[in-house]
Amino acid sequence: MLEELRDIMARLRDPETGCPWDVEQDFRTIAPYTIEEAYEVADAIERDDMAALRDELGDLQLQVVFHARMAEEAGAFDLKDVLDSISAKMIRRHPHVFGDGASPGWEEIKAAERAGASEDGSALAGVASALPALLRAEKLQKRAARTGFDWPDPDGARDKVAEEIDEVRTAATDADRFEEMGDLLFAVVNWSRKLGIDPEAALRAANLKFEKRFRAMEDIAGEAFKGLSLEDKEALWVRVKRS
């Protein structure tokens, strides 16, 4: 089946007989679609929609095949190389399953892979700059924590959040407020991490809760909703929240 999808992509990318849109794409133009498809997979999982998950996984697989095809055209690698590479990586990272159970642990193996792939010896090496900011903040903090640079308990992280709130409040310029708001968001992610809470999952849940309540307000008020005063909307919000 994967071979069929690979052949379809080859035909779509054919300069003479393929699809003009597919032919003109490159890695950079396709990358946003790859990210979008990954989020749509996560959304289907969040909604527990198996039919949608099936379709979205297919769309995500298409992105892999698309990138692999472009790489093959450039003479860099092909789809088989991609599959061989991930298979070898999974075997290497699971010596307790595929080899000597006394082999190094997961983190040691990953650290060795990073060291072999880059001259950057930092503990933060390999944290992709293109990750969503919330996720990247958490990954950077986790990496730093492994070196011992971390709050000993959640209280220190909580106090840092309070400190950053004050700094946002007292910032003198827009540029200062921008910087301090970034520090505040970073601190909130850190506090969440210290409490054992996935900040991305927590924010997704908060988004869904807000959306559900706001839609309920719209349903109750109908077409009159937009014309309600802020006071009436706040009263409606409290009503929905209590229901």
Q: Predicted segments — roles?
A:
Residues M1-L57, L62-M181, L185-S243:
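Flexible "arm" and connector segments at domain edges
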